[in-house]
Amino acid sequence: MSFPYFISPEQAMRERSELARKGIARAKSVVALAYAGGVLFVAENPSRSLQKISELYDRVGFAAAGKFNEFDNLRRGGIQFADTRGYAYDRRDVTGRQLANVYAQTLGTIFTEQAKPYEVELCVAEVAHYGETKRPELYRITYDGSIADEPHFVVMGGTTEPIANALKESYAENASLTDALRIAVAALRAGSADTSGGDQPTLGVASLEVAVLDANRPRRAFRRITGSALQALLVDQESPQSDGESSG
């Protein structure tokens, strides 16, 4: 007589966690950090069409690491939620904490109820409304729905430990955009060097996706930095030239 295969709930959760962590670790890294003018997002991403960084609403941005189809589905759902709430109530009623909580609830439900967890890690960031002086808010949401409020920076995907260690050593509050980008790129290079046996790779315009939430912009704070505008900020980095321009 054969008995049905049994797995304890604890073992099932451990296996789900391991699956999700391995999937996220295979992804290229993403960094989000607060700087003097708002929040800077920097991702290792050679693709120009499969973007890891996005606007969610007027003062709220999104970044993710992991499986693209899964986090893009979450991104679109967040935009729809924000648009609906902003239309039904008031645009100022849409906050980063609110969207982070929605993502945490969604990922927690998927982790416990679906056959396979999402292999994603998310960051939701918000800057103050134009003319206000509130500090930027950074939220990290993990594959199981855990949520954390990070005061300075978030690191996701790839080998996070060397990147986080580099940021702990070099991060400076109220840094300029140029300095913040230099700090973020140097940290990403430290993570890439750890996985490539110590060689410091070149991260330039062609291999980076960069955007900011600019607290000094009225209404919509999100702005991508591409092409020659990014190249100008990377003058100290060895990077290839690109013909694109900064977009609004």
UniProtKB/Swiss-Prot annotation:
Its main location: cytoplasm. It is found in: Cytoplasm. GO terms for cellular component: cytoplasm; peptidoglycan-based cell wall; plasma membrane; proteasome core complex, alpha-subunit complex. Phosphorylated by the PknB kinase at three threonine residues (Thr-84, Thr-202, and Thr-178) in a sequential manner. Phosphorylation enhances proteolytic activity of the proteasome. It comes from the Bacteria. Pathway: Protein degradation; proteasomal Pup-dependent pathway. GO terms for biological process: modification-dependent protein catabolic process; proteasomal protein catabolic process; proteasome-mediated ubiquitin-dependent protein catabolic process; proteolysis involved in protein catabolic process; symbiont-mediated perturbation of host defenses. In the course of search for new antibiotics, a class of oxathiazol-2-one compounds has been identified that selectively inhibits the M.tuberculosis proteasome over the human proteasome and that kills non-replicating M.tuberculosis. InterPro entries: Ntn_hydrolases_N (IPR029055), Proteasome_alpha (IPR050115), Proteasome_alpha-type (IPR023332), Proteasome_asu_bac (IPR022296), Proteasome_sua/b (IPR001353). PROSITE patterns: PROTEASOME_ALPHA_2 (PS51475). Pfam families: Proteasome. The keyword Repressor does not apply. The formation of the proteasomal ATPase ARC-20S proteasome complex, likely via the docking of the C-termini of ARC into the intersubunit pockets in the alpha-rings, may trigger opening of the gate for substrate entry. Interconversion between the open-gate and close-gate conformations leads to a dynamic regulation of the 20S proteasome proteolysis activity. In vitro, chymotryptic and tryptic activities of the proteasome are both completely inhibited by epoxomicin and by the peptidyl boronate inhibitor MLN-273. Also inhibited by Mg(2+), Ca(2+) and SDS. One of its GO terms (molecular function) is threonine-type endopeptidase activity. The modification Phosphothreonine is found at residues 84, 178, 202. Was identified as a high-confidence drug target. The 20S proteasome core is composed of 14 alpha and 14 beta subunits that assemble into four stacked heptameric rings, resulting in a barrel-shaped structure. The two inner rings, each composed of seven catalytic beta subunits, are sandwiched by two outer rings, each composed of seven alpha subunits. The catalytic chamber with the active sites is on the inside of the barrel. Has a gated structure, the ends of the cylinder being occluded by the N-termini of the alpha-subunits. Is capped by the proteasome-associated ATPase, ARC (Mpa). Component of the proteasome core, a large protease complex with broad specificity involved in protein degradation. The M.tuberculosis proteasome is able to cleave oligopeptides not only after hydrophobic but also after basic, acidic and small neutral residues. In complex with the ATPase Mpa, degrades protein targets conjugated to a prokaryotic ubiquitin-like protein (Pup). Among the identified substrates of the M.tuberculosis proteasome are the pupylated FabD, PanB and Mpa proteins. This is Proteasome subunit alpha. It comes from Mycobacterium tuberculosis (strain ATCC 25618 / H37Rv).
